Amino acid sequence: RNERLFYYYIMSDLMKNIPLVYTPTVGEACQKFSMMFRRPEGLTLSIEDKGSVEECIENWPRPSDAPRVAVITDGSRILGLGDLGWNGLGIAIGKLSLYVAGAGVHPQSTMPIVVDVGTDNEELRNHPLYLGLRRPRPSTEELVEFVDEIMMKLNARYPNLIIQFEDWSSEHAFLFLERYKNKYPMFNDDIQGTGSVILAG
């Protein structure tokens, strides 16, 4: 694939092409993400790697000063489509593509992340081509413990990285925003992004 050509095309008529990168196309792409896997560039942090997150992050193929913005999701509430588990990686990739095409962020400065903790979507979990963990989602306590490790290790490796939480369940979106907002350079797009746009209008 040719990343330069992709962004050249998208930016040649941004308003016309945005729907190809994000809503509505990204929703269908996420639903079928495991079935049309094309080696996307994104970081999967699996709950089965708890205790080894630092090593997983170190495998990201960029210099330690390169990533400037990350979009992180657990795939639990993708758009209006519900729990898509690991397939939620597509939403992180799509959102960062908007930042590249619309805001001039360099592609090498982006970091799409999916926190794979399983899925409660049984149909997806049982699909023979599904690439995520085939287990139900953990308790909130176990999830918080894992995400705490992720945030700590991401910040230690990339202290200037802005971390955007995207499409988490409402319960966990508010929980993590309250937990991390004064500790790390992070925000929740679904809560703060929407509110900011309304206030700006």
Predicted regions and their residues:
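Metallocofactor- and cofactor-centric catalytic cores in central/energy metabolism, strongly enriched
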Residues: 1-201
